[in-house]
Each structure stands twice: as structure tokens, then as C-alpha cells.
């Protein structure tokens, strides 16, 4: 049986991680032997990996430190194809294949607009990523971008030949989305007769710009009774909680944290709002629409404009 390997730093909550779990599940359902190779096997999506996918834990704390472990894995397992996601993991995957000399077909994927990611960080290492991409990405068999905007930005920023970069939208709507959407939800805000709930879903980071959503919610409440719920965790939680207190919204804004099944919230929400400053694709927009929920998004680069009118 042909083996496929998928390589990631971890399964901490993010769109790329969820997409890779979906891919692993889909490949396994089609009869392939699938390994999910993680620099460190941790994160909330770990519980969503199906039993017919083997998790390989390289057991290191940083993606860079996974290089030798990934080289050993490639030599031992000789996968027919290897897929990776997130640019720092992509670079390690390419480097590992070069060192291992294993003839695995290597496909790397970009899930965010590179320019936006670089401009919105102070990390010196992150500023080196475009140079490393120029050096390493041509050595991959293919580079996948999750939207045309991400592809165009990647080509413009790094000078990669356009024929090297292929656009493939994220596999978001798996059959289980619909069964998950119909699971019971006990939260009192979603009971009959309660005010409509506006939903935001994503990591609490600068990219997702939930402060803009909270401030917009203040304007909505001046016209209509409503509540706001934000699903997700991240480093900006303290700032967001402080803003909610400052605006006197404690009774009408809830942040339950990361949830295993956001679909059942989406199905019962009046509206899903994506307030991001930038996106690669916008998985939650597709998920919410699959659940039958109206969506609104900022016109940010890159993905939402390719999903919505």
C-alpha cells in the first residue's frame, strides 16, 4: 500500500492544521497508508485525527529541531509523497529530503499571504523567510497556494516562477461538517426566544482583528438586541477581555475559548463575521455557509474576496 506523509510543527488550533487533518482523513478513507508527522504531537486537533492515520511524534519543541528526526523518518519509511504546510515547516521538509536523498514527491503549501505575515511581525527570523523560500522552494516538486491572492503575493515577494505555484482551495466541507452541525448545543444563548448571536471564530491574534469586531458590535447593539460570541484562544485574549470590560460588554460578549466543534455554534448563529486584517483563504466562511449561516467579511487580502461576492 502506498504511503503518504503529512508534516507539520504541531496540531495547535489553526486553519492549516485543520486542513492537514482533513487531508489525512481523506487520504486514509481512499485506502492510502497515511502518517501525520509532527515536530511535537500536541494541540487541540490531535483528538480529531482518525484512528486509521498514524501519528509520528518527533518529540521536539521547535520545528528547526525536527530536521534530523524527519531525515530519519524519510529514510526509514520511504513515503511515496510528502506534504507539508506553513513556510518554516516547508523549509525543513525540503531540507530533510535533500539530506535523506529519498525520492519522495514533496509538495509544500502556503496558507497565508507572505507579505502580510512578514509586515506584521517584529521577528528577525521571520524577516528571513522570503530569502529562505527563494533558496528552498524551487527544490520542491510543487508549491500549493490556498488562494490566487496567496499565489500572486508569493510569486511577487520571492520571484518564484509562476508555473511552480499551483492554486488549490482548502478542503473544508467534509461530510462530518453536517453531522457536527446537528449535534446538540446546550448554551443558554442559543435557546428559543434569546437575542440573535453574532459569531466570530479564530485564533485571538493580531491577524484576526477581533477588536474591530467588538467595536462594530457596539454599533449593532445601538440598533438591535444582540450578543457576540468569539470562539478561539490566543495571545491577545487579555487585551480583548480588557476592551470588552472597557466598553461595558461583559454581559453580551462571551469568549468560551477553543471548541472541538464550532459547526454546531455556526448552525445556530444569526451571522458569522470574519474581521481579519489578512487571510490565506478563510475556512470559517465556507464552513458557516455549509451550515446555512449568513456571513460577512472584511475585504482583506487574500481569500475572502475569492469566496464571497
What are these regions (language model features)?
Residues 64-68, 105, 115-136, 152, ...:
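Nucleotide-sugar donor phosphate/pyrophosphate-binding loop at the beta->alpha transition
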Residues 6-64, 158, 164-166, 235:
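N-terminal strand-loop element at the rim of the active site
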Residues 17-22, 196-219, 235-242:
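A conserved mid-protein helix/loop that constitutes part of the nucleotide-sugar donor-binding site
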Residues 38, 294-298:
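Short hydrophobic beta-strand element within catalytic cores of glycosyltransferases
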Residues 119, 152-193, 260, 264:
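Acidic anion/phosphate-binding donor-loop and adjacent secondary structure
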Residues 262, 282-285, 297, 304-307:
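Short glycine/serine-rich donor-binding loops of glycosyltransferases
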Residues 84-92, 110-112:
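Short His-centered aromatic/hydrophobic patch
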Residues 258, 277:
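Aromatic "clamp/platform" in nucleotide-sugar-dependent glycosyltransferases that forms part
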Amino acid at each position: 500500500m502506498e504511503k503518504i506523509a503529512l508534516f507539520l510543527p504541531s496540531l495547535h488550533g489553526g486553519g492549516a492544521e485543520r486542513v492537514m487533518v482533513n487531508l489525512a482523513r481523506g487520504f486514509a478513507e481512499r485506502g492510502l497508508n497515511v502518517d501525520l508527522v509532527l515536530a511535537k504531537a500536541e494541540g487541540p486537533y490531535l483528538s480529531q485525527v482518525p484512528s486509521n492515520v498514524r501519528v509520528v511524534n518527533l518529540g521536539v519543541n521547535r520545528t528547526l529541531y525536527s530536521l534530523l528526526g524527519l531525515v530519519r523518518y524519510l529514510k526509514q519509511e520511504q513515503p511515496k509523497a510528502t506534504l507539508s504546510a506553513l513556510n518554516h515547516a516547508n523549509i525543513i521538509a525540503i531540507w530533510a529530503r535533500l539530506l535523506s536523498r529519498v525520492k519522495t514527491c514533496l509538495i509544500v503549501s502556503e496558507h497565508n499571504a507572505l507579505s502580510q505575515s512578514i509586515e506584521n511581525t517584529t521577528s528577525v527570523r521571520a524577516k528571513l523567510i522570503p530569502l529562505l523560500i527563494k533558496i528552498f522552494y524551487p527544490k520542491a516538486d510543487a508549491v500549493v497556494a490556498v488562494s490566487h491572492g496567496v499565489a500572486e503575493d508569493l510569486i511577487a515577494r520571492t520571484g518564484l516562477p509562476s508555473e511552480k505555484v499551483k492554486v488549490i482551495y482548502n478542503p473544508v466541507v467534509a461530510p462530518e461538517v453536517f453531522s457536527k452541525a446537528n449535534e446538540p448545543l446546550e448554551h443558554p444563548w442559543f435557546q428559543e426566544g434569546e437575542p440573535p448571536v453574532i459569531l466570530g471564530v479564530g485564533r485571538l491574534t493580531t491577524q484576526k482583528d477581533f477588536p474591530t469586531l467588538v467595536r462594530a458590535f457596539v454599533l449593532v447593539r445601538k440598533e438591535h438586541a444582540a450578543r457576540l460570541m468569539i470562539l478561539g484562544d490566543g495571545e491577545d485574549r487579555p487585551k480583548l477581555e480588557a476592551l470588552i470590560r472597557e466598553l461595558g460588554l461583559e454581559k453580551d460578549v462571551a469568549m468560551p475559548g477553543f471548541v472541538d466543534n464550532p459547526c454546531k455554534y455556526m448552525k445556530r448563529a444569526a451571522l458569522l463575521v470574519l474581521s481579519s486584517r489578512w487571510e490565506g483563504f478563510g475556512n470559517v466562511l465556507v464552513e458557516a455557509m455549509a451550515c446555512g449561516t449568513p456571513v460577512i467579511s472584511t475585504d482583506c487580502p487574500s481569500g475572502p474576496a475569492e469566496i464571497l461576492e
